[in-house]
């Protein structure tokens, strides 16, 4: 809920119940799937505020050669790169949609910048610059170098196939990309 008075300690894909019952979890009490302020243990309430700044500070790293995008989320980056002010804006609905767009909003001169991208697990990634494919890959980090100009558009296209997963209890889950 918006006031954080109802969350689950243990979330299960395709869960059909949120109740107090003995389960086969080795380290979770019987109320672990129940919604509340502090179900099972109070760590969520105590630590919830830490996630947002940690998530934000790990979206993109500046390197000696350019920028490395590690996590995909709407953001704006304004920094000096080799003495040149660079402003990048990312817009995306990833992982719910398969696209992300990074626009070079402002840059002085025409510096060569290396752009690196982490390929999320269970996906492959294709990168287009101004509509032309420049690199693709299905694991690790993929990268390209370009002399950038204001207005350049970098598009990330994530291929996220739908797969089925058989769980240890023989139930089946569906996975689409990282979801």
What residues fall within each predicted segment?
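Glycine/proline-rich low-complexity spacer/linker segments in large multi-domain proteins
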Residues: 67, 158-179
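Short beta-strand/loop motifs in extracellular/secreted proteins, especially
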Residues: 111-115, 123-125, 152
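Aromatic (Trp/Tyr) and acidic
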Residues: 1-119
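Solvent-exposed beta-strand/loop surfaces of large extracellular or lumenal domains
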Residues: 122-147, 164-167
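Short strand-edge motifs at loop-to-beta-strand transitions and within beta-strands
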Residues: 100, 140-144, 152
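Short, hydrophobic/aromatic-enriched beta-strand segments in well-ordered soluble domains
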Residues: 119, 151-162
């Amino acid at each position: 809920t918006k006031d954080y008075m109802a969350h689950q300690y243990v979330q299960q894909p395709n869960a059909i119940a949120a109740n107090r019952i003995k389960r086969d979890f080795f380290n979770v009490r019987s109320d672990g799937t129940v919604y509340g302020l502090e179900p099972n243990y109070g760590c969520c309430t105590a630590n919830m505020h830490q996630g947002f700044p940690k998530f934000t500070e790990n979206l993109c790293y500046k390197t000696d050669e350019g920028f490395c995008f590690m996590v995909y989320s709407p953001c704006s980056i304004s920094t000096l790169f080799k003495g040149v002010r660079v402003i990048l804006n990312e817009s995306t609905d990833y992982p719910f949609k398969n696209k992300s767009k990074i626009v070079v909003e402002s840059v002085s001169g025409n510096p060569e910048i290396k752009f690196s991208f982490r390929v999320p697990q269970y996906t492959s990634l294709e990168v287009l610059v101004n509509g032309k494919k420049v690199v693709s890959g299905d694991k690790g980090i993929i990268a390209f170098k370009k002399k950038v100009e204001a207005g350049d558009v970098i598009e990330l296209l994530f291929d996220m196939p739908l797969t089925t997963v058989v769980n240890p209890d023989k139930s089946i889950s569906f996975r689409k990309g990282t979801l």
